Amino acid sequence: MRHRKAGRKFKRTPSHRRMLLRNLATDLLDHGRITTTLAKAKEVQPYTEKIITLARDGWNLNNFRRALTVLTRREVAFRLFNEIGPRYKTRPGGYTRIYKLAKVRQGDCSSMAVISLVGEDETPSKPNLQGGASPATTPQVASGV
């Protein structure tokens, strides 16, 4: 029985599974979003969030080397520490989001999903007012008889 066994095996050897997660995490940090199966997206999400937390804590040689043990390309590690980490400096967690897709993969009918970095494709919903609201724009209540 497989009770209390965490993680998915994906019918791969441990080294192949580890390399799969490394490649998915590297591609996610490089492109900002990837389309994959739902199971792989759920498995790579905590893996990626731990790496982003390393970069969020700031650049030092130890954190950079720890990130390089996970990522497969050095330029992605530089981008992680220079762009992605500072972007999430004030965010306490939840750097990625998984969207389930309605379509399934044609060959084996597996559920597909998009995993993306939060804030990668979002635009601010409110305009940024530099000077604040002026008194002329606040609504006036008419007092009449």
Give the positions of each predicted feature.
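Structured, basic alpha/beta domains of bacterial-type, RNA-associated proteins
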Residues: M1-M19, N23-V145
